């Protein structure tokens, strides 16, 4: 039986990385990023005031790296993709936690070097929740939030994705965030989505899908790209 086609809704440049991973698996996929990322108007503060930078996405790493050449502050990253982006940009040292922002906060609190300035800068999407800031402040850190980039709904579905959904053929949609899931549903307004199944990076990311009544949602056991793709592999093996 032919594997269903896969729709990648992740924003760029990460979407291209996901597409390459799918091609390595000899899977047919179409790109249709549900979100467009852009620089916000937030000013970057003097980084010398901080004892470290908290990154909860690879995009945060990329946007900050475009703004400053400073790389000497410890980078505290959620997940391997964010840590890899920080290493590629030359940050040192780079610390990596597994899980989500709450796990990262716990990791920082338990691995923070004694005697080091406990003031942190959290770089993220303007719509990011304040969970990281709240959790770290409860552990005695002083945290400034820098909403360095914004994510807005893409103008439309990619033509290939629109045609694929319109055919009614079974297809799989990869979902990397709750905001991306909500944007994808908005872009699909008026389309019959009954033939779609979903693989979401986390239960939080799947939230808008469940609220919309979507069915056939598989959740990665850990919120990172590797486990998302493993969940996809497992799902395809049972089709």
Located regions from the model:
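Signature of uroporphyrinogen-III synthase
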Residues: 1-239
């Amino acid at each position: 039986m032919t594997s269903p086609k896969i729709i990648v809704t992740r924003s760029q440049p990460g979407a291209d990385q996901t597409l390459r991973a799918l091609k390595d698996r000899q899977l047919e996929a179409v790109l249709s990023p549900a979100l467009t990322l852009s620089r916000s108007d937030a000013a970057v503060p003097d980084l010398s005031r901080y004892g470290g930078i908290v990154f909860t996405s690879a995009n945060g790493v990329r946007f900050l790296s475009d703004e400053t050449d400073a790389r000497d502050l410890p980078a505290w990253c959620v997940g391997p993709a964010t840590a890899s982006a920080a290493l590629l940009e030359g940050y040192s040292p780079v610390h990596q936690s597994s899980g989500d922002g709450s796990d990262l906060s716990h990791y920082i609190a338990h691995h923070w070097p004694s005697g080091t300035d406990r003031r942190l800068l959290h770089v993220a999407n303007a719509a990011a929740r304040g969970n990281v800031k709240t959790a770290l402040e409860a552990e005695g850190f002083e945290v400034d939030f820098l909403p360095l980039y914004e994510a807005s709904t893409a103008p439309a579905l990619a033509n290939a994705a629109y045609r694929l959904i319109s055919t009614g053929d079974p297809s799989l949609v990869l979902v990397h965030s709750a905001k991306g899931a909500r944007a994808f549903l908005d872009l699909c307004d008026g389309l019959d989505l009954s033939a779609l199944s979903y693989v979401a990076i986390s239960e939080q990311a799947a939230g808008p899908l469940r609220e919309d009544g979507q069915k056939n949602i598989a959740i990665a056991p850990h919120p990172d790209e590797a486990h998302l793709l493993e969940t996809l592999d497992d799902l395809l093996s049972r089709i």
